[in-house]
């Protein structure tokens, strides 16, 4: 066999491996990619956002969660795109999220949330949150609650190549089009909370702990100056302990305000404010 034929055969045989090496990426838990996505998961997790309640009723409300910043050092890829500068991760200061709650048979409570796909500062979220819980205790005393929750959907944003990177001649983004990358948080968890009652039941402090299973998926969507589109996927699986605490203040008979701190000790801390009102008679 001639030398050119040998070279051609080697390229053909090696092509699938080459494509895989330049395609999907599976960084380990100690990589910057995994650590950054774990930080994103802290404010995106569908936390309880209220004190355990034996008689919750129908509720509607709005949550505002602080989005912890990712440092430039941590936003710099270490596995999937080595040599690239920091990703554009700090796009918003806070995340608003509507919440709805309703009682179910057997003393269960369902909470749900949906962030509609409206683009704000380049970010478009289409996120859903669900939780199912069961509370135990006595009115006016200690109340415990066990809860399962999930967050799923997607967020689109120019994370890989924002406008500034497109104008940076030293960046691989230079001369391309602004990326519209997608991250799917895929958070599932269990938690246990304990709450009390003060000020005649108007102030109800609570605290607890839980476990979150994180399966975030990130997909690049960037077209460079040569018209080549990068559709690389980044897959991470993580397990996290979470701690939380807060208090619900009953402002009126129908209106309540909750402040909550929610933390993954190895990643970040977020603060939440949730205003709720009773719905119906």
Feature roles, as predicted:
Residues 21-139, 151-153:
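Transmembrane beta-barrel domains of Gram-negative outer membranes and organellar outer membranes
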Residues 54-56, 91-96, 124-128, 184-188, ...:
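Residues that define the transmembrane beta-barrel architecture of outer-membrane proteins
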Residues 60-62, 100, 110-112, 132, ...:
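Membrane-embedded beta-strand positions of outer-membrane beta-barrel proteins
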Residues 64-68, 114-119, 136, 148-156, ...:
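Transmembrane beta-strands of outer-membrane beta-barrel pores
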Residues 72-77, 82-91, 119-123, 150-186, ...:
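Extracellular/periplasm-exposed beta-strand and loop segments of Gram-negative cell-envelope proteins
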Residues 106-110, 139-144, 202-205, 253-259, ...:
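Repeated loop/turn-to-beta-strand initiation elements of outer-membrane beta-barrel proteins
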Residues 108-120, 128, 144, 255-266, ...:
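Transmembrane beta-strand segments that form the barrel wall of outer-membrane beta-barrel proteins
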Residues 132, 267-281:
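Outer-membrane beta-barrel "beta-signal"
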């Amino acid at each position: 066999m001639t030398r050119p034929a040998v070279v051609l055969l080697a390229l053909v045989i090696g092509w699938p491996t080459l494509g895989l090496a330049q395609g999907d990426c599976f960084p380990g838990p100690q990589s910057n990619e995994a650590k950054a996505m774990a930080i994103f998961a802290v404010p995106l997790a569908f936390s309880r956002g209220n004190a355990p309640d034996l008689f919750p009723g129908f509720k509607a409300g709005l949550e505002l969660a602080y989005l912890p910043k990712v440092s430039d050092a941590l936003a710099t890829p270490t596995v999937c795109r080595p040599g690239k500068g920091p990703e554009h991760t700090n796009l918003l200061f806070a995340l608003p999220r509507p919440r709805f709650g309703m009682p179910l048979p057997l003393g269960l409570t369902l909470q749900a949330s949906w962030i509609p796909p409206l683009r704000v500062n380049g970010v478009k979220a289409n996120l859903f949150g669900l939780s199912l819980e069961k509370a135990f205790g006595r009115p006016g005393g200690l109340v415990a609650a066990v809860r399962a929750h999930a967050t799923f959907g997607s967020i689109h944003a120019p994370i890989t190549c924002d406008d500034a990177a497109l104008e940076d001649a030293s960046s691989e983004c230079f001369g391309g089009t602004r990326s519209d990358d997608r991250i799917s948080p895929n958070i599932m968890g269990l938690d246990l909370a304990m709450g009390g009652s003060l000020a005649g039941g108007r102030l109800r402090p609570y605290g607890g702990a839980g476990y979150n299973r994180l399966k975030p998926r990130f997909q690049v969507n960037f077209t460079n100056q040569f018209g080549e589109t990068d559709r690389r996927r980044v897959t991470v699986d993580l397990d996290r302990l979470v701690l939380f605490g807060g208090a619900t203040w009953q402002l009126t008979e129908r209106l309540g305000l909750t402040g909550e701190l929610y933390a993954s000790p190895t990643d970040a801390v977020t603060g939440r404010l949730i205003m709720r009102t009773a719905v119906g008679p």
